Amino acid sequence: NDGDLDILSAARIDDTIALYTNDGASDPSWSATDITTSADGATSVFAADMDNDGDIDILSASKDDDTIAWYENSGGPFWSASTITSSADYAESVFAADMDNDGDMDIISASANDDTIAWYENNGASNPSWTAADIATSAD
């Protein structure tokens, strides 16, 4: 929340979700922070404020463990991991948007082996829970 653009990465081979923080200089240098090293086959990341606390959290999709995960920004160097689902068969992508116009961010994912686009509705609590619904199950 310092106004500088930072970079997120998903590394499939070493299972790492990493944040590269921009120092804000005109010729920036970057500080790397591993968010997790256990996102088995990480394929996609997305940044959004998932719990409406004013800071940016991270979502990931991991295809080798079929997982969509949320990493809550606690304001320090540590991130709290929560599994949204572990049944997104070969999870390929993740995105966040307010799908139902209720003021909180919901999660959208796509998974290849089950051809599914799924929506996980945020209940809006400060420690949100998610209700899954399929948008499509034949998204080849």
What are these model-predicted stretches?
Residues 5-11, 58-62, 107-111:
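Hydrophobic beta-strand segments that make up the repeating blades of beta-propeller
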Residues 1-9, 53, 130-140:
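Intrinsically disordered, low-complexity linker/propeptide segments enriched in Ser/Thr/Gly/Pro
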Residues 1-4, 23-25, 48-55, 63, ...:
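Calcium-coordinating acidic loop motifs
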Residues 16-20, 67-71, 116-120:
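A short loop-to-beta-strand structural motif that recurs across blades of beta-propeller domains
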Residues 12-13, 51, 63, 100, ...:
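A generic beta-sheet turn/junction motif
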Residues 14, 42, 65, 91, ...:
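Short coil/loop residues immediately preceding or within conserved phosphate-binding loops
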Residues 21-40, 72-89, 121-140:
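Blade-edge motifs of beta-propeller repeat domains
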Residues 43-50, 83, 92-99:
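Beta-propeller blade termini
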